[in-house]
Amino acid sequence: MDERPRNLRAMLAEAKDTSELMVDLAYASVYFGDPDMAEEVDELEEQMSELVHDMRAVCVLAARSPREAEGMSSVLQVVSAIERMANDAVDIARIVTHRLGIPRQLVADLSDAEEVSHRVLVSDGSHMAHRPLSSLELTVQAGMRVMAVRRGRQWITDVDGDTVLVPGDVLFLHGSPDGITRLRELAAAPVWEPPRPDEGEVLTDLDRAVDVLVEMKNLSEAAVGVAYSALVLGDRGLAAEVGHLEESLDEMRDHLELWVLRAAADGMDPSSLRGLLHLAEAAEDLGDQARAMVWLVEEGEELHPILGIALGEADEVAVRFPVAEGSTVAGSTLKDLQLNIEPGFTVLAIRRDGGYVYRPRGAVRLVAGDEIIASGPEEGQALLATMCRWELLEDEG
């Protein structure tokens, strides 16, 4: 990006958005086997490196006393964790760019995800060309939201309904995989066929390893989302849950390595197993960095106020709403509610009976007393509050 924000608050918000976009695209590049998408992650990594350098410089300049230095140390800890998350995204994308190999079973299993990221090029003469996003209604037409637009060398991350698309724009979207076919029709992009596992293969330990890795992907994404939520909300309970997720990821990696080695011993081609180990390592480290990010919250230490403010001003905000008796959402499944379309929120976790359900699937039914932890566009949080039978009051301070 040619003109980077120099304000620390703005840079932190951009770094959060960029790191999440990188992780989404990295996993998507594996799913689609798309080298172009993987290379986009590398380009974003260059932008992230510049942001991290600038943020560290600002923190050093701002620490003019021991008290200020202590406050800025928490900011630097978060900056370092964000940088490592971006590096993990690059490592995931290298599975594609370096052709490390990945079993088709994994790619097919990833297609069962409730939400995926996708990349599409806007062609000249397509339905999308020369039209504002608001008129396309992509959330309704395809069940997907535009997270960013790349126009030449410029990245547009503050996308809104007034953004007019032009031929050559590359859109990065997130939403239901069921909408990919319709999305590509609107962009006049080539037809895409979803991956399917090879027929007739005997799946034993490899099948188990793949299932674990898909769960690791889901938990690593949940850990990142819940960690940002814990920082914004200053919630020690959420921070502790990030720790539990990180421990689960550690255990899963141990199991996965064992099953991969057994699969190799059974005669499986080792070249297609390297990517599994590589992906597991990156997914585990995402959990490690999420925990590092919230360690101060978990310990009850004071955070610099700019963290909550900046991360709350990112393209996606974190919210936590109890489900009230008689509300619109009470008694409905997430699939029926389609919160990812309207008001555009992804449910990261549901707190229920003292525990958490992470990355809940569409069949999960909300009940009164549940607490929803979700992320989405700021303009949609009032509607989500209303659906939970709460009124969002504006801060007059």
Report the location of each language-model feature:
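Cytosolic, long alpha-helical scaffolding segments
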Residues: 1-397
